[in-house]
Amino acid sequence: MRHYEIVFIVHPDQSEQVPAMIERYKQLVTSQNGNVHRVEDWGRRQMAYMIQKLAKAHYVCLNIECGKETLAELEHAFKFNDAVLRHLIVQTKKAETAPSPMMKEVQREEARKAAQTTTEGQAA
């Protein structure tokens, strides 16, 4: 089995369905003797360029270990899901379990916002 990093972009109107989509894809991998090493929901972010007249979308990253048949089935699921705007599958040499640089940035932004609200609350 090989290791893969998958990033897919979901239509912003379908953001509330992202947890169910993640669960469905995780179940697909694990049901065929694969492993899910990391799941990161990066949230709604600004895209580099417009896709279908949309400037923002919901980003999700998965690090999995699976066979070629499972990967083909996942790719098929991405292609025929209208909510998935784009997907990228990259083969990696080993399982990545540490937070990605993107997730570290998201955590930094959340910490900064939390710090701002506490300082604003103290100032009032």
Curated annotation (Swiss-Prot):
Residues forming coiled coils: none
Residues annotated as transmembrane: none
Chain positions covered by the region annotation Disordered: 96-124
Keywords for the protein's UniProt record, in alphabetical order: Ribonucleoprotein, Ribosomal protein, RNA-binding, rRNA-binding
Signal sequence coordinates: none
Residue ranges with Polar residues bias: 115-124
UniProt GO BP: translation
Molecular function per GO: small ribosomal subunit rRNA binding; structural constituent of ribosome
Pfam family, one: Ribosomal_S6
Disulphide linkage map: none
Record flagged with keyword rRNA-binding: yes
This protein's record includes keyword Transcription: no
Primary role: Binds together with bS18 to 16S ribosomal RNA.
Homology family: Belongs to the bacterial ribosomal protein bS6 family.
PANTHER family from the UniProt entry: MITOCHONDRIAL 28S RIBOSOMAL PROTEIN S6 (PTHR21011), SMALL RIBOSOMAL SUBUNIT PROTEIN BS6M (PTHR21011:SF1)
Protein's UniProt name: Small ribosomal subunit protein bS6
Native source organism of the sequence: Cupriavidus necator (strain ATCC 17699 / DSM 428 / KCTC 22496 / NCIMB 10442 / H16 / Stanier 337)
